[in-house]
Amino acid sequence: MMVLEGASALSPFRRARLETRLQTLVPALRLTGAWHVYFIRADAGRTPDQATLQRILQAEPAPAPRDEAASSRYVVPRLGTLSPWSSKATELMRGAGQPIQRVERGTRIDLAGWPEGEADQAAVAKLLHDPMTQSLLGSAAAAEALFNVPDPGQLERIPLDALEQANGDLGLALAQDEIDYLRERFAALGRDPADVELMMFAQANSEHCRHKIFNASWTIDGKPQERSLFRMIKHTHQQTPQHTLSAYSDNAAVVEGVPAARFRPDPATGEYRSEAVVPSAFAIKVETHNHPTAIAPFPGAATGAGGEIRDEGATGRGGKPKAGLTGFSVSHLRIPTLPQPWEAPRALNPRMAPALDIMLDGPLGGAAFNNEFGRPNLLGYFRSFELAEGQGLTRAYDKPIMLAGGLGAIDRNQVEKLRLQPGDAVIVLGGPAMLIGLGGGAASSVAAGDSAEALDFASVQRENPEMERRCQEVIDHCVALGTDNPIRWFHDVGAGGLSNAIPELLHDSGVGGVIDLARVPSDDPSLSPLELWCNESQERYVLGVPQARLDEFAAICARERCPFAAVGVATAEERLVVGYGVFDAANRESGIGNRNSALPAAEAASAHSLFPTPDSPLPINLPMDVLFGKAPKMHRDAVHPAAPQWPVLQTGALDLQEAGLRVLAHPTVASKSFLVTIGDRSVGGLTAREQMIGPWQLPLADCAITLAGFETFDGEAMSIGERTPLALLNAAASARMAVGEAITNLCAAPVQTLDSIKLSANWMAAAGHAGEDALLYDAVRAVGMELCPALELSIPVGKDSLSMQAQWQVGNGESGIGNGETPAPSASAIPDSRLPIPGETLKSVSPVSLIISAFAPVSDVRTQLTPLLQREDESELWLIGLGGGKQRLGGSVLAQVYADDSALPAFGGETPDLDDPQRLRQFFELIRDAREGGLLLAYHDRSDGGAFAALCEMAFASRQGLDITLDAWGDDAFRSLFNEELGAVVQIANEDRAAFADLVERHALTECAQRIARPTGTPRVRVSGQGRVLAEWRWEALFDAWWSVTHAMQKLRDNPDSADEERAVARNFQAPGLRPKLVFDPSEDVAAPFVATGARPKVAILREQGVNGQIEMAYNFERAGFRAFDVHMSDLIEGRVDLAQFAGFAACGGFSYGDVLGAGRGWATSILERAALRDAFAAFFARSDTFALGVCNGCQMLSQLKDIIPGAEHWPRFLRNRSEQFEARTALLEVVESPSILLRGMAGSRIPVAVAHGEGRAEFDTAVDQAAARVALRFIDGDGAVASQYPLNPNGSPDGITGLTSTDGRATILMPHPERTPRSVNLSWHPAGWGEDSPWLRMFRNARVWCG
């Protein structure tokens, strides 16, 4: 084994942060350093070139510890597994000609003062590594165990009389009637079950997978109910089936879209083309991933996003994920640097991550997966809620809600799956099996705390988004074949792993199957049959393909370097047989064999006829109806709880000034910027409305909007509605308000009719907790039987998660909060009434929670509305409220921020509600008609924080003050400002007042509408009523309260200096924001004369595995008059394509090789370390008639090729952003005078651009290089000065440098993404006078002009 040491693994501030956390455990412990370490095993009998390895890894031979007093610990991938990093890095090194069997990366951590006590050592070890995916070693030599091949685990038989014990030992979460069912079925089979059969049954029949409660029969308060919960949900679709193409029968629902043309490469030639405009469709799906996020926030949220993405991809015969949404509900954050008066200390569950850790790490996990996969995340919500309900019981989200959803494109001819036929191949597409996520379906179906801690961690999956991107590229290619798509039917692999996905695949087609476990790709040879069959390793799909097309399918996968295995065959007999070495004699001897060798003949009809007589009993040999047959049906007997006892908030003693600041500072109301800027929102080039709005880029949009294609202004919109705290007082009202809020949010988009809106309903509850079952039934009935039918709304898709409670027993010394970033308060800080008693059982129970996501096709996206106030001197703000004159405060944020330390805070009273559904219909039609009539300048819905929060957010977004007048609102200023009834604030020009008032009257909403405020240019917000000023705030004071959570969270999570700089920029009332300036006319098509000749030069749209920005890049070149071709690096390596045939190439953005060697370095290494490929690129660059463009990941890659690019010798490398965070921003660029052929005639322009990268900070070898480099683009502020302040300069590059060119201008590299905004409508904000073409399209037209 060779050991090399690389660069420091921690930046100074992250090192200091880790040391602080270590010292909270062991005060004398010192962190003296942390370095990347590489462990390399060569092929037997061969020696790799060490100099080459050092060059590729940027590493040196490992020295001795740098501090003699230090004790070194090595964090390495879990022994016995192969990390995703290793598989990619090993592939790179082999491609570079190195005889490497495997390379792994670890981290050497040097510590002084290593503790002697076992408890302290265990606590430190837990902080240093994740035991699910990592091992902690005491020496580098011990890492030799990484390369050991352990013996596989064995199959176990479980005696029928031991099923109850196995239920607990294996964490099966089976009910007694299910155990009795299994005992009866296996007794009839005459044998004991195998452990793998029990685990498979438990996963396939878990509450998570089979939704037993939603399908149960019900008795409420002694009265039998006619309908199940699911039947009431289906009632909405039965009443309003129009516009829905698929409901309840697939991985996602499919709804009608607008006519559009797909733009994609021809699968035969690789040339990109716009297909004919046809009626389109889109898939919609929203999942939750609550249990894994509670246990391990980053991977839990990441795999939640990944699983939902796979659902969209596996819809019909193949969909294309397009835009995502994310949401979180947690308990109080308790930020150490931002204590809040409503956050009373209490004991927390030591087996679950606290809310602060969840919100520091979970959003990063979800964002990272979306970013690397290449799906923009355009929508979200965040709620923090916690309320005491008596000794030992808290109503809170200790078990969080982690929402992951989105919409995806799907061709109409791919919506219906085709049944598998006997003889069809059963394929596993994607990554290898590993011992992760074992039993996740069952684990997420029980209350947190009811299972063993080891089982909790075993149930959490781990993510590899770059692998999922490769799978999606395979799916896209198959779909592009149209009706000739080789995929008949497929599922994503989620809960239960292959043990759930493959039986579902077969059962849905009415067939059985024989599966060879020896063919299942695995990176862990120690896996037992149970572990191999049931683990939930991510980024996998199962699909059926005719055997006659296996070679074709294999070629598609090989081009994308996407692993797949033909693991079995469908049979006519409906029996599932699973064993080892089923199809190949060699497999029976070695346990491995060729995973894609020939399968049995298609005419096979019997499972037994395919299986040779085994030497030992089969792991699985069951009739399919054991899994999918008549398992016991659940019955729920529920009773309504007593009326809530929380007192009513008395507003008479409150201070209005203080109340406004508190409400804005509550995390549910406060700025979500820290959750938004970590996620890419522009990838794909079809975004028309993201969260950020206006020149000052604040995250205040009410909904998200995407374009249906590159050449239409129609598209799709989505929004979220949720008002979960209200359920503690009125569950039905909470559900109605969730639906209402989703609609009022969606009104900002040009949706034409209510019946075109389709809802996803995500239901959460603590099933079994006293009264909660009845409240859940009330909520479902209110929506499914009453509200949605009345409004012609349907719910074709959804999800339930009904174990939303956590319980634990207090041990000695557990007196307060203590986990992760959150310090433990002393016992004296907790009121006596809240002090837990050792041995006491504590419980946290969430409210009944409905999260509604609304989706709809939209017409002209240019007519969308945002909260950005137009700077009209003569305008006013109107409130349209749907509360029928009521101003109910029960459950409001105002009540929450005045929750005191008493046992029952003043949270109660009557809640907001949608008393009259038709009033919401009238509101929807009013806003639609007013928008189409050009009467609305701005729009913002009223929600948490009431009209006061909505008004302040509009003022923040627009850098304006407000004069608010309450005279027409009633006598109680608190009720007027802070009630959270449904409604919206709109801006109307004075000249349109009469026309708007007339429209309001025509829609019978005159009693609901009132003029409430005027925008001003003064930095203050003033509230007046009854002839006097009731309160007045400085604009900055209100903004600081609203920004406080983002600032505090960024300081904990990111570079604290960057957080301080952003706050200074954001709170500056006088800041100019984005202030574009153009020196050319974007509507002038300078390439038109050249295009008119009919000549269309060929350009290669170059991508490597993990690249995700090729489609929008190709569109820009095609639009400018080129023939754009999809060229994978494997095409060049294997000689299918020659770079010499192209006039230019564009290296696209993404995460090539998952950036395992640093951003773009893996891609560059694959070129530089292959002599033939290096020569081909060098020859291309040397030609005087070629050009090259590198964007983002392509920029990083080309910067590593500077030695073979003439005139690029002074280019920098690109390192981690100064904020140490992925940055997704709209920034202002200045086009600098340079030789770049792409930027001719643009110098001096200042143009907004999408930025999305984690490693964009330019670093030059020397000051001479920086001075000599040909800078083409730089970040500037709104006044045109070079930007040095974050986030105006989002990556911290010197002098704002973010684009460079070669001395002759033929090679240009840039970190921002101009290719994502070919049309003005793609920009987050642009001046009103800009036409259809974005200024950035000029770059590509310039390239066409240069080609002649």
From Swiss-Prot:
SMART domains: GATase_5
Biological pathway: Purine metabolism; IMP biosynthesis via de novo pathway; 5-amino-1-(5-phospho-D-ribosyl)imidazole from N(2)-formyl-N(1)-(5-phospho-D-ribosyl)glycinamide: step 1/2
Swiss-Prot/TrEMBL catalytic activity: N(2)-formyl-N(1)-(5-phospho-beta-D-ribosyl)glycinamide + L-glutamine + ATP + H2O = 2-formamido-N(1)-(5-O-phospho-beta-D-ribosyl)acetamidine + L-glutamate + ADP + phosphate + H(+)
Keyword Lipoprotein: no
Record's GO cellular component terms: cytoplasm
Keyword ATP-binding set for record: yes
InterPro entries: Class_I_gatase-like, FGAR-AT_N, FGAR-AT_PurM_N-like, PurL_large, PurL_linker, PurM-like_C_dom, PurM-like_C_sf, PurM-like_N_sf
GO biological process: 'de novo' IMP biosynthetic process; purine nucleotide biosynthetic process
Localization of this protein: Cytoplasm
UniProt name for this protein: Phosphoribosylformylglycinamidine synthase
Organism: Xanthomonas campestris pv. campestris (strain ATCC 33913 / DSM 3586 / NCPPB 528 / LMG 568 / P 25)
Annotated catalytic residues: C1192 (nucleophile), H1313, E1315
